[in-house]
C-alpha cells in the first residue's frame, strides 16, 4: 500500500528547531510561545488559510471531523437558581463569583460535590391532583376475579374497520362502536 509508505517517511526536522533554542519564546521575531491554544491551528480548507468554509472544521492537529466553534460551546445556563447577578464573564475561581453569580456552590450539585444527588435535581414535580384522579380511575374498573363487563358504546359512531372486515385491531380498546360486541347489534 503506497499510503502506508508515505506515513512512515521521516518527518521534516521541525522538532530540531525547537531543541536548538534555549527556551520557547526567546526569539523576538516569532510569536512568544505560551500555553497551547484551545482553538487549534488557524482554519484551513483546501490548503488555503482563512477560508470561510473551513471555520467549522478546525480542531487540534491530528483530530478528524468537525469541531464546535468556541462561541457556540458556552456552558449551559444554570437552572432553578433565579437570575444571574454576576452576568456572563470570566470565572475567577471554579466556585467563586463569575458565571454563576454570587453562589459559592458548583452549578450542578451531585454526589461528588457534596450537594444533593442529580436524581433529585432532575426530578419533575409531582402533581397530587393527577395522582388522585388516577386512583379514582383505577378503582372504577372491576376486580380481575369478576367477569369483565363491556362498556356500551352504541351511542358512538360505528367503527369503519369493524363494519368492513368484521374485526378491528383495537378490539376492546377501540373508541368506536362494534355492533354486537360492545353494544346491541344493528
Swiss-Prot record:
Bridged cysteine pairs (disulfide): none
SMART domains: ZnF_C3H1
Pfam families named among the record's database cross-references: zf-CCCH
Composition bias, Pro residues: 33-44, 67-79
Keywords, in A-Z order: Metal-binding, Zinc, Zinc-finger
Transport in keyword set: no
Origin: domain of life: Eukaryota
C3H1-type zinc finger span: 153-181
Gene3D superfamilies: Zinc finger, CCCH-type
GO MF annotations, alphabetized: zinc ion binding
Ranges where the record places region Disordered: 1-97
Keyword Zinc: yes
InterPro entries per the UniProt record, alphabetical: PRR3, Znf_CCCH, Znf_CCCH_sf
PANTHER family: PROLINE-RICH PROTEIN 3 (PTHR47398), PROLINE-RICH PROTEIN 3-RELATED (PTHR47398:SF1)
Name assigned to this protein: Proline-rich protein 3
Organism expressing this protein natively: Rattus norvegicus
Gene transcribed to yield this protein: Prr3
